[in-house]
Amino acid sequence: MLAARNMLCARVALPYVACFASPRPTYPTVLARNAGLRPLPPVRRTMATASRTPHSPPASQHVPESVPHDQPFLLPEIVSEALHVPMFSASAHSMVRVPSPRQFYSTLRHHIMKAQHRIFIATLYVGKEERELAMFLTKALARRPQLQLTILMDAMRATRESPQSASSASLLSHLASMFPDQVDLRLYATPVLRPNSIASRIIGKRFNEGFGLQHMKVYGFDDDVIITGANLSRDYFTRRMDRYLLIREHKPLANYLHALILLLSRFSYALLYDGDPSLLSHVKGHIEDMDDSSSDYVQLTRSAFRLHWDGGSDLLLAEDTDGTIATAGLCPSTRACLETNWRSSATQALQDFTMRWYERAKAQRPASGDTRIVPLLQLGQLAITQETDMIPILTQYLSALSPRALGPTAARPYTTVDLTSGYFTLSGLYKSLVLSDAIHRHSQAPVFFRLVAASPEANGFFGSRGLSGRIPAAYTLLEKLFWNRVVDKRLHAPVHPYVDVSDPMSEGPLAPVELREWSKYGWTYHEKGLWITGPSLAQPVLSPATTLIGSSNYGARSEKFDVECSLLITTQSPQLQDTLAKEVQEMRESARTRMDTATFRSKERRVDAVTQVLTRLLRPLL
C-alpha cells in the first residue's frame, strides 16, 4: 500500500506549475478598474514546502498502472500529503446525515439550546426574519454565562437591506452589546471592495456581492459540527433542498474549523449595536419573559448598527499553541492588521494555519477509525486554492483506479462519479475532470460521470424581477454550452454494456457523461456534492466511499472570488456508504429530466439574445 501511495503521490503531487501562471484579468478586475477601484496586486504564493513551489524539481513519472481497489484511504492520504493539508481520522458512527430542511432547523435549535461552552458559526447570512433563531441564541447566552458565541457572515450580504429595513446585521447586532464577554460578531468583506466605499455605492448593493463573498457554511456547537451548503433563512429551513452532515464529538475537527473562523475574523469588521441602550437593557432584563414576537424584542432586532475595524485585537477567543480554543489574552498575541492592504498578511496567516494543522493532525491522528476527513479551503483572492488543487489529483486517481485486478467476474467493474450543483457553472478545472481524456480513454476501466443540475423552475431566482429573472435562463445556456462539449467529445452515448441496477432513474447502459435536471414541485435546489463509487468484486449496487461536501458550487466564483470550505470524506464503513448511496438515490429520484441536444434545442429552452450576451459577459460572477 505504501509503495502504491508513494508512487501515485509522486505523480500527482506536482503537476501544478501551470496552476501558478498569472491568469488573464477576470471580469471583476476589469469592472473594478472601470469603477475606479485599484485592482489587487498579485499575491506571491509562499507554499509550505518546496514541493509546492513553481521551482520544484520535476516529479517522478513512474506511476502504478492501477490503484488497488481495496485501499479506501489512498485518495485522502495522497491529497493530504501532496497539498500539505490536515487529515483527520473519524468514526462513521459519529456522522449523521440530516435528511431535510426542517430537520436541519430542528437540529440547529437543539444544538443551540444544549451547547455548554461554545457556538461557532460561519454563514453567508442569517435571514432577517429569523427572530426565533436569534431568540434561541439570546436565551442560550443568558442562561449559560460560560457560553462563547462566534459568528462570521459576509459584510455585503448581511447588510444588503439596511438601512431601509431589517437585515442580518440588525437582527444580531444586539448580541455583542448584551453579552460583551461572550459574543464576537464579525462581517468579512472582500479585499477588492470595502463596505460603504465610493465604489461600492456606485456599483450597488446587489452587484457588490459579485466581487466575492464569505460563503462558508459551518455550524459548530461544543465539539459537534454541521457542514452544509445551506444558509440560515426561512427557505433553507422549509423548501430549499441542500445537504447537511452532522459530525458528533470530534474535537480536533471542531477546533480546526473554529480556529479557521477566528482567523478570518481578524480580517473582518466587528458588528456593533448602535441602537437605544435603554431598549437593550430592558430586553436583557426581561428576556425569559419574551418570545420572538414580543414588540420590544422585534424593535431591538431592527435597531441601528455599525461596523468597526479593530484588526482582530478585540476578539475574545484565539487558537492556542496546542490547537485548542482559549481566551485570547491567554494565547500568543497576533499583530492587528490594518483595514487596507491586509491581503498578503491574510494569505500568509492562512498558509501558516494550514501547515500548523497539517503537522498537528499528522502527529495526533490515531491509527483507528473507519473514516478520513480532509478539509479543503478555497479563497482565490487570497491565493488559497486547496479545493481546486485537489482536482488534478482526483483526475489522476480516477484514471488509475482500475477494476482489472478484480477479474472478469467483478460485480461492478467500473467507477461512477455523481456530481451536482444547484448553480451549474462548472469551472475549467471541474470541466477538465469530467471531460478528461486520461479518464475516458481507458476502455478497460470505465468511469461514468452522472451530473445533476437544477431545472429552471428549481433555480432560486426563478420568477425574480429585473436582471435576476434572467439567471435561470443563463444557467440553461451554460448547461447547453457544456453539453455541446460533451457531444463533441462523444461522451454522451454508452460505449459499455454496464447498467447500474441500484439507480432509480436507470435507462439502460451508462454513458461516460450524463446530465439530468432536478425538479420538485414547490421546491428549489441548492445541493452541491461529489460522490465516488469505485469498482467492486462482490457489490453490484451504488456504494460511495468518497464524498465532497461543503459550500463550494464548483464554479468560477467559488474558484476565484468566494471564501469556501469543503470536506473530502472517505469511509470504509458499509453503514456510512449506504447513507451516501441513499443520498444520491434520493437526489436522482427527483432528477427525471435527462438532458440531450434535442432538449436544449426545444422552444422551452431557447435563451434570448440579451440573456446570452449578459451571460457571456457576467459568466465569472455566476
Regions found by a protein language model. Give the residues of each.
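Short acidic, glycine-rich surface-loop motifs adjacent to enzyme active sites
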Residues: 116-117, 121-124, 421
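Generic alpha-helical secondary structure signal
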Residues: 20, 31, 277, 301, ...
